[in-house]
């Protein structure tokens, strides 16, 4: 479990690489560029994790409670919430254990701590990979529902959605295990970066095509109305804003972490790259922020889910 300076590793397997690049960057920065390091207090980090944990637990509870939400679309949303929940749990657990070890409130053998760190690392990596996969699955589900509306229920069945989610979880566990085992191979890091870029391109293409189709649909409906241009312009701006939010949040929250991995593979000893490495904890905080924002974008906008969520909250009281 890392406990040196402000470097807190998301993946324990990267500890040696991160500490080496940090020390090299520090010595280089004495005569090199000034580094901007954004400090994220442990208290704030824990609070973000707990907010994400509670929020995603409510999403899972609401979907499990309401049988009307047992559909392929909500299956993907529920799995996204589970992935984000695991991201939050693993990061909160790792931070809490690290603070207890530093304070001397928790005594454990080095081998036990290392085993716990490896388990947390697998949880973190698998949940991150699965979270990205389910974001792509939600985009594909919405795309099929628009462009193949009449055949949607025959194409996207609940059983197929369940098989797809099982495959995603299995792929997440397998990829995280390989990543932990071969963390020092540049190809492994680059594969993760390519995977992220593929998900980004997939979401951008699908959502942009859906926006174009929606604008054409509105154009056909409003063709006979006098205020056709104003209606089309307003809808186009709203759709563009929605697309910008979807892709902007995705890129802002996930991009810095994968930029970090890219720089580890490309320029681990460069002074400028070492400046980026110093903000690794900030990149983790952004990923947890994504876990907070995901339910607001994909889950809480549904009226049926909001209604069930109120019932869950009233029942809990």
From Swiss-Prot:
The keyword Transmembrane applies. The chain crosses the membrane at residues 38-63, 73-93, 119-140, 164-183, 192-211, 241-266, 280-300. It is a multi-pass membrane protein. GO terms for cellular component: plasma membrane. Pfam families: 7tm_1. Glycans are attached at residues 15, 29. The gene is MC1R. Belongs to the G-protein coupled receptor 1 family. One of its GO terms (molecular function) is melanocyte-stimulating hormone receptor activity. SUPFAM superfamilies: Family A G protein-coupled receptor-like. Residues 64-72, 141-163, 212-240, 301-317 are cytoplasmic. It is found in: Cell membrane. This is Melanocyte-stimulating hormone receptor. Disulfide bonds: none annotated.
């Amino acid at each position: 479990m890392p406990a040196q300076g402000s470097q807190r590793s998301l993946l324990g397997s990267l500890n040696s690489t991160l500490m080496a690049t940090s020390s090299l960057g520090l010595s280089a920065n004495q005569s090199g560029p000034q580094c901007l390091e954004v400090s994220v207090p442990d208290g704030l980090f824990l609070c973000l994790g707990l907010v994400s944990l509670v929020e995603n637990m409510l999403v899972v509870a609401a979907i499990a409670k309401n049988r009307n939400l047992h559909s392929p679309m909500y299956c993907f949303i529920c799995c996204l919430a589970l992935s984000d929940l695991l991201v939050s749990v693993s990061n909160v657990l790792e931070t809490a254990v690290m603070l207890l070890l530093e304070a001397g409130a928790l005594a454990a053998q080095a081998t036990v701590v290392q085993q716990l760190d490896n388990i947390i690392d697998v949880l973190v990596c698998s949940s991150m990979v699965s979270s990205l996969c389910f974001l792509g699955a939600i985009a594909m589900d919405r795309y099929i529902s628009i462009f193949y509306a009449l055949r949607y229920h025959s194409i996207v069945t609940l059983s197929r959605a369940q098989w797809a989610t099982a495959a995603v979880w299995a792929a997440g566990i397998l990829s995280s295990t390989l990543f932990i085992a071969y963390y020092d191979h540049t190809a492994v890091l680059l594969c993760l970066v390519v995977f992220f870029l593929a998900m980004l391109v997939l979401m951008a293409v699908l959502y942009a095509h859906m926006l174009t189709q929606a604008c054409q649909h509105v154009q056909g409906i409003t063709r006979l109305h006098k205020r056709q241009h104003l209606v089309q312009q307003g809808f186009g701006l709203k759709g563009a804003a929605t697309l910008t939010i979807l892709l902007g949040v995705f890129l802002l929250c996930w991009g810095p972490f994968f930029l970090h991995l890219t720089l580890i593979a490309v320029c681990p000893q460069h002074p400028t790259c070492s400046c980026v490495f110093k903000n690794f904890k900030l990149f983790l905080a952004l990923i947890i922020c994504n876990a907070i924002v995901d339910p607001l974008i994909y889950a809480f906008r549904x009226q049926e889910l909001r209604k069930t969520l109120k019932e869950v909250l009233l029942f809990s009281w």
